[in-house]
Design a protein with these regions (language model features):
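Phenylalanine-focused residue identity feature
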Residues: 5, 26, 84, 108-109, ...
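Catalytic domains of cell-wall/extracellular-matrix polysaccharide-remodeling enzymes
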Residues: 140-246, 250-266, 272, 279-280, ...
Length: 285
């Protein structure tokens, strides 16, 4: 039996309120407008290109079978957002295959540097499959991006430029700070006030910044087996009715892709519906 809750809007609002709760363990930064386009022209929401579904939608605009139901429906299932950082890479095709097989969406917080240039076309493939593309970093070098607020936004501008051939810039609405919004490494390079400044600037510019409350721990240094990755995710999700799961599709996290079918199966068996990060935000609007 699948559990139900009042509405998708109510669940999304709950997630937002949880951002100020220490017990929640993740944060969502809400902004009133979309980010300024690369051209610096007036902010005009751009629909997806012909034939490309919006995030969380399948071909023709139909809902992905595993995605969360629309707010108009009376019931709401427990929600899970699968998110992947640090790709695309050689690991990403296996991640996309698992998502397609299970018919569920995910959100990819991408990087774009000299190490993964040949994999950037996978961004288009992910978007066309109904996944959401979001921003992480061009370089992911803490010493560079966190030396100042200006350096951080220069890195984001470069990332947007590099991925522009593969995704409609007007559809990219979210970002994740490398290390998360509560990271301590930024203090080493930019001072104690830097992250607060960046969060404020992100919201002023229209970006939605996103943390997590469940982690696969697949980028913590130790090489994990697929079983360990799955256990970290499912164990961290037990008892939660809203999950934003941090995983990685970097070149060194192949076991995460191996674990993904089991992870998805566990969430389905527990009655969760799958959605992208922006689906949660859009329910608030």
């Amino acid at each position: 039996m699948q559990r139900s809750f009042p509405t998708l809007r109510a669940a999304a609002r709950w997630l937002l309120l949880a951002a100020v709760s220490a017990a929640a363990g993740f944060a969502l930064g809400v902004a009133a407008s979309r980010p300024a386009p690369l051209s610096q022209a007036a902010v005009i929401p751009t629909p997806p290109p012909a034939g490309q579904p919006a995030p969380g939608r399948g071909p023709g605009g139909s809902s992905l079978p595993g995605a969360a139901p629309p707010a108009s429906q009376a019931e709401l299932l427990p929600l899970v957002c699968l998110t992947f950082d640090d790709g695309p890479s050689r690991t990403t095709p296996a991640v996309l295959a698992a998502l397609e097989e299970a018919e569920v969406p995910a959100t990819f917080f991408v990087v774009a540097n000299e190490n993964n240039e040949s994999y950037l076309p996978l961004i288009r493939q992910a978007a066309q499959a109904g996944c959401e593309i979001a921003l992480h970093s061009a370089s992911h070098r803490y010493s560079d991006i966190y030396r100042s607020a200006g350096a951080f936004w220069e890195d984001i501008a470069l990332l947007r430029q590099r991925i522009a051939p593969y995704v409609d810039d007007g559809e990219v609405r979210c970002l994740r700070f490398p290390g998360g919004s509560t990271n301590t490494v930024s203090r080493k390079y930019g001072g104690d006030a830097l992250m607060g400044q960046l969060k404020e600037q992100a919201e002023e510019q229209g970006w939605r910044w996103v943390d997590w409350n469940v982690s696969a721990e697949d980028a913590a240094g130790k090489k994990l087996s697929a079983e360990e990755v799955c256990r970290n995710v499912t164990g961290g999700s037990a008892g939660l009715e809203r999950c934003i799961v941090l995983m990685h599709d970097s070149a060194t996290t192949g076991t995460t892709a191996e674990a993904l079918p089991s992870i998805i199966r566990w969430y389905k068996e527990e009655g969760y519906a799958f959605c992208t990060v922006s689906q949660l935000y859009d329910a608030l609007e």
